[in-house]
């Protein structure tokens, strides 16, 4: 099953702690991002994978910074979406945010994820493309 989330990817933020109530909480913009991703996942009406191992193939398309946009030879690479992003934020933080948001919607539990293919690519059209496939046991 394939899903495209047409909003710029956002990395998982660190939990914040409230000293008065002694509780951990998430920043509001992170909560809003996860709700938006969940909305797109539910609106896709894809069938949830209830059990068994799955593979997540995720590509995060990130809008490039100005220093990359200024170079003419990069323009063609950006249009082809083949210029990899090797800067912060870390790939695992993007992965955590997206898998938390679709947990319970596209699959029952994120513990089902047994294989991962993840990429960060610069693009003029920021979005996240997610493909979930069931892994079959070979007998």
Predicted segments with their positions:
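Acidic, proline/glycine-enriched N-terminal capping motif
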Residues: 1-139
